[in-house]
A protein has these predicted regions:
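A non-catalytic, helix-rich entry segment at domain boundaries
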Residues: 1-44
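A general structural signal for short secondary-structure junctions and capping/turn motifs
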Residues: 24-26, 108-111
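Substrate-binding beta-hairpin/strand module that engages nucleic acids
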Residues: 67, 73, 109-131
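Non-catalytic protein-protein interaction segments used by genome-maintenance enzymes to assemble
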Residues: 41-98, 102-104
C-alpha cells in the first residue's frame, strides 16, 4: 500500500475526490515533498531512527511550515463510528506522530508549532488531525 502512495508526488486537484486524496494535492506554489524518507539523529541523549511516509514543506508570510502525513491501514471495528475510529487512531498513534514532529523540527529547523500532523486513513479514505 505504501508503495502505491509513495509513487504520488502530487495529485491533480481535479482527481482528488476523498479527504485522503486531497492531502496529496500541492498546497501552495513552491511546496516540496519528501516521500518515504528515512532519518537518523541523536536527540535527548539517544539515537533515534524512523521513516516519514510523507512530509510537505511550504512557506507562508510567517516562514516555513510542514505537514507530516502518515498512512494507516487499520480497519474500522465492527459497529465503530467513523468519529470513534478517528479518535482511536489519534490516540493509538499520537506518540509516534509527536516523535516525528520532534525529529522533523530538529532535522529541518522548523518550530514544532508550525508542523501539522495528519493520519491518512486508507480504509476509509479519511484524515485524522493529531493534536
Amino acid at each position: 500500500m505504501h508503495e502505491r502512495f509513495s509513487a504520488v508526488e502530487w495529485l491533480s486537484p481535479d482527481k482528488a475526490k476523498t479527504a485522503l486524496e486531497k492531502e496529496l494535492v500541492r498546497p501552495a506554489d513552491g511546496a516540496t515533498v519528501w516521500r518515504e524518507r528515512a532519518y537518523e539523529l541523536f536527540r535527548d541523549g539517544r539515537w533515534e531512527s524512523g521513516q516519514f511516509d510523507r512530509v510537505v514543506f511550504w512557506s507562508d508570510a510567517d516562514g516555513r511550515r510542514a505537514k507530516i502525513c502518515d498512512y494507516k491501514t487499520n480497519a474500522v471495528r465492527n459497529g465503530e463510528s467513523l468519529d470513534a475510529f478517528k479518535a482511536r487512531m489519534r490516540e493509538t498513534y499520537r506518540g509516534q506522530m509527536l516523535a516525528y514532529r520532534a525529529a522533523l523540527a530538529s532535522l529541518a529547523d522548523i518550530p514544532p508549532s508550525r508542523i501539522e500532523l495528519k493520519l491518512l486513513l486508507v480504509s476509509t479514505q479519511g484524515v485524522a488531525l493529531v493534536e
